[in-house]
A protein has these predicted regions:
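Detector for outer-membrane/organellar transmembrane beta-barrel domains
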Residues: 235-241, 250-254, 260, 283-358
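A subset of solvent-exposed loop/turn segments in beta-rich extracellular surface proteins, enriched
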Residues: 29-228, 244, 266-290, 389-391, ...
Length: 414
């Protein structure tokens, strides 16, 4: 089934508006910020005396690549003259590995009731979160074909396997129960306005040195939502905190769920093209037939029947904290999922300064980028409020040659 021009314009307009609203903050590092502070807080449980429920608000944005620096990525997104040195530098950084780029941005509001449920150790809790994430990967050969051409590839096979691009956004409103140590489980209603994804399963491209023989083959598929989808998602946390144990352990499961997508537009390509030359005109393949309207429609199939069940890009976080002294500690965290090509590993040192300030430094590896530093600071206000800022790759904020930027802000009532 073909998509009408009017429908395609609406989809493009929607994506443009959403990108314009979110790209300035672009991807994110939504880690368990409250967990980093637990091990060095005093053993007291202050009560919020305001009329509002205990709550926290977290906002984040981050983008990261292992090959493209901020300057080249900005030119590719916004347009402009691209200097060849930027292209060559990104190609040298990629080497023979897959190039990757990812982003994540959004916010999460979490609240819980003051009183326990009917004289139990459980209380009601809930959250509202909005997220937008994206993931793209490409082979070195595809990078060359797109940005520099195939002049240096004549006589060799270019491999495109594993190249992909995908993006999605969703809103999750959840309600659940929370027990001791903030252990909780929530079930949420998910609204997903859009998702698109494309993947080249196998792809090859070859032109001989005499430039008179071409071979191209591709098996790929793509899918784009035409209507908003609805589904269910589960969030859960478990925190091991014991006075007799010299350490703390945290497990967080986020956005484990499924979405029902009605009538998505699906494309499939399974084509092999071989030629040793094309006539100007005539029956079959010719230069004239390549220019005819609708020629490309014979290379793929499309349909939009039925519904699809699609998994949300959930994430699992495992955190370990070990106090080195009453005011210092060592943290280790591993994050899995959320379309990251590699697990993200984090290790850091934290210290408390007086009763109201904490700060820490970290080293991050994996995810969408190479090894990079991070730093955070937390201010516990006298009125039982706290504010925290987390910056990934802080030196990258002042340099166009950085491979990404990220910031997370959190405000909470204690």
């Amino acid at each position: 089934m073909k998509m009408s021009k009017q429908s395609m314009r609406r989809n493009l307009l929607w994506l443009s508006v959403l990108a314009g609203l979110t790209i300035p903050s672009m991807q994110a590092f939504d880690l368990s910020l409250h967990a980093q502070a637990d091990s060095v807080q005093e053993d007291v449980h202050p009560m919020d005396t305001s009329r509002f429920l205990p709550w926290s608000l977290t906002m984040w944005g981050q983008h990261r690549s292992n090959t493209m620096d901020h300057q080249l990525g900005q030119l590719l997104v916004r347009g402009g003259n691209i200097d060849r040195t930027l292209v060559d530098a990104a190609r040298a950084a990629q080497g023979g590995d897959m190039g990757v780029f990812g982003f994540s941005s959004g916010f999460q509001l979490h609240a819980r009731s003051r009183r326990m449920w009917k004289e139990t150790n459980w209380r009601l809790c809930g959250s509202i979160q909005a997220r937008w994430i994206g993931d793209s990967r490409w082979t070195p050969e595809l990078y060359d074909l797109v940005l520099t051409g195939n002049a240096e590839h004549l006589g060799r096979w270019d491999v495109l396997d594993g190249t992909r691009a995908r993006s999605t956004a969703w809103l999750n409103a959840a309600i659940g129960i929370e027990g001791q140590h903030h252990n909780r489980v929530e079930l949420g209603l998910v609204y997903r306005p859009f998702q698109f994804e494309g993947l080249i399963h196998t792809g090859y491209f070859y032109v001989n040195e005499a430039v008179d023989d071409l071979h191209a083959s591709m098996r790929a598929n793509a899918r784009m939502s035409r209507k908003a989808g609805w589904g269910l998602g589960v969030n859960a946390e478990w925190h091991f905190l014991r006075e007799e144990a010299p350490f703390a352990f945290h497990v967080q499961l986020r956005n484990l769920g499924v979405v029902l997508a009605p009538n998505p537009l699906r494309f499939a390509v399974d084509t092999v093209l071989e030629t040793s030359g094309l006539p100007l005109s005539g029956a079959g393949w010719s230069i004239a037939s390549l220019q005819d309207e609708g020629f490309a429609e014979g290379l793929y199939t499309a349909d939009s029947s039925g519904v699809d069940f699609q998994l949300l890009p959930g994430r699992l976080d495992l955190s370990f904290e070990y106090p080195l002294s009453p005011r210092t500690g060592w943290d280790v965290q591993v994050q899995l999922g959320e379309w990251m090509p590699l697990p993200r590993a984090i290790s850091g040192f934290r210290r408390a300064f007086g009763k109201h300030w904490q700060a820490g430094v970290q080293v991050i590896a994996g995810g969408w980028g190479r090894v990079r530093p991070a730093a955070w600071a937390r201010w516990r206000m006298p009125n039982e409020r706290a504010f925290m800022i987390y910056i990934e790759d802080p030196w990258g904020w002042g340099s166009d040659s950085a491979y990404g930027r990220g910031v997370t802000l959190r405000y909470e009532s204690l």
